[in-house]
Amino acid sequence: MFGVLNSSDHRAAVQQRNIPAFGRTSFELWTDSPTSNHRCETGGNGRDSGQNRVRRPMNAFMVWSRDHRRRVALENPQMQNSEISKQLGYQWKMLTEAEKWPFFEEAQRLQAMHREKYPDYKYRPRRKALPQKSDKLLPAASSSTLCRQVLVDEKWYPFTYRDSCSRAAHPRMEDHLSSSQPVNIANSLLQQEHHYCSTSLRDSPETLAMHLSADPPF
């Protein structure tokens, strides 16, 4: 049922397949490949597989650089496509208006043919992908004032504290709220908050000096 492939024929076929295409530049190899042609027709990433993407008509620079790009690629096989584009852009700027005029006329002719062939064509540039937003929340400022409510005997009492004192006052608040205390616990919590704030200020001499300078004189 299956034919036997001779080992010498198989070896010759493999060697012929692996022979590089000498004399052809990287630019010609790129444009001759079917994937590159499909990439050009679909706009760069091959997404429009269902319907062909209509290419834009060439402008004057593209008409001029069509032949010059091939010439530069043949003279410099190792040069990358981006470097060739930079060199062609520099050469195009050095041309005079009289030298550029024939290419402008050719570009206008191609644009007129394009309008006749695709009367409903509209250029739709691809939108750049937006960067993903980070889910991390920004840290709050150290001087921001946070407001909480204290539940005491089924009544809510507003309780305000600053970030510098929250680490010391908040655990004590939870301890007191977990046990059943009379209604005047809110006053004791406020006193404890003032005590912890003054303790934290006493630990740092610089902060204490700033605090004393901010107090009004008696």
Swiss-Prot record:
Interacts with CALM, EP300, HDAC3, KPNB1, ZNF208 isoform KRAB-O, PARP1, SLC9A3R2 and WT1. The interaction with EP300 modulates its DNA-binding activity. The interaction with KPNB1 is sensitive to dissociation by Ran in the GTP-bound form. Interaction with PARP1 impaired its DNA-binding activity. InterPro entries: HMG_box_dom, HMG_box_dom_sf, SRY, SRY-related_HMG-box_TF-like. Transcriptional regulator that controls a genetic switch in male development. It is necessary and sufficient for initiating male sex determination by directing the development of supporting cell precursors (pre-Sertoli cells) as Sertoli rather than granulosa cells. Involved in different aspects of gene regulation including promoter activation or repression. Binds to the DNA consensus sequence 5'-[AT]AACAA[AT]-3'. SRY HMG box recognizes DNA by partial intercalation in the minor groove and promotes DNA bending. Also involved in pre-mRNA splicing. The lineage of its organism: Eukaryota, Metazoa, Chordata, Craniata, Vertebrata. Residues 33-53 are annotated as: Disordered. Keywords: Activator, Calmodulin-binding, Cytoplasm, Differentiation, DNA-binding, Nucleus, Sexual differentiation, Transcription, Transcription regulation. One of its GO terms (molecular function) is calmodulin binding. One of its GO terms (cellular component) is nucleus. This is Sex-determining region Y protein. SMART domains: HMG.
